């Protein structure tokens, strides 16, 4: 029972719409009506500016990061294969990612999973996050597309999990990669059409 409560709480925390709340509280803007219409960090930068964008990014990362430690904080007794699986920090963090992407508060239409996924990886393996961040910013420096950089970093995580034989990480990163590609489908189309806006700060 406690495992179910933990997973639901992780989802609900992940579903907290940081960008929407910051936009409405401090800018009187619903960021869903501007830019890409997304509630995540990238659109927050675009619509609300850098300071607010950094705050939203921090909050979205923190959502994923904190949930990784739920199995340590909750009195969870894992006495079998299934219970052990669902008390793994990566799996608990995955529920936060799902909450961020499909928030119950916003009719299941949320962000694109990038920052919250980074928070989960930070909590589980900071060195891996550093490697993925280097890949992300390297691709961003070359191509100037946040969407492309995010997808390549996610796929790199899948490849890395195969190399280190971490199959739970493989499962989670595989799911996240699929979600990222689906959520960035319109961005991918615009990239091929040459219509995707490029960042200007790098």
From Swiss-Prot:
Chain ranges passing through the membrane: 2-22, 54-74, 81-101, 120-140, 162-182
E.C. code: 2.3.1.275
InterPro entries, alphabetized: G3P_acylTferase_PlsY
Catalytic function, reaction form: an acyl phosphate + sn-glycerol 3-phosphate = a 1-acyl-sn-glycero-3-phosphate + phosphate
Keywords in alphabetical order: Cell membrane, Lipid biosynthesis, Lipid metabolism, Membrane, Phospholipid biosynthesis, Phospholipid metabolism, Transferase, Transmembrane, Transmembrane helix
Record's keyword annotation contains Methyltransferase: no
GO MF term (any one): acyl-phosphate glycerol-3-phosphate acyltransferase activity
Record has Cell membrane as a keyword: yes
Subcellular location: Cell membrane
Pathway membership, UniProt: Lipid metabolism; phospholipid metabolism
One example of a Gene Ontology biological process annotation: phospholipid biosynthetic process
Function: Catalyzes the transfer of an acyl group from acyl-phosphate (acyl-PO(4)) to glycerol-3-phosphate (G3P) to form lysophosphatidic acid (LPA). This enzyme utilizes acyl-phosphate as fatty acyl donor, but not acyl-CoA or acyl-ACP.
Family per record: Belongs to the PlsY family.
HAMAP family, per database record: PlsY (MF_01043)
Record-given protein name: Glycerol-3-phosphate acyltransferase
Source organism per UniProt: Staphylococcus epidermidis (strain ATCC 12228 / FDA PCI 1200)
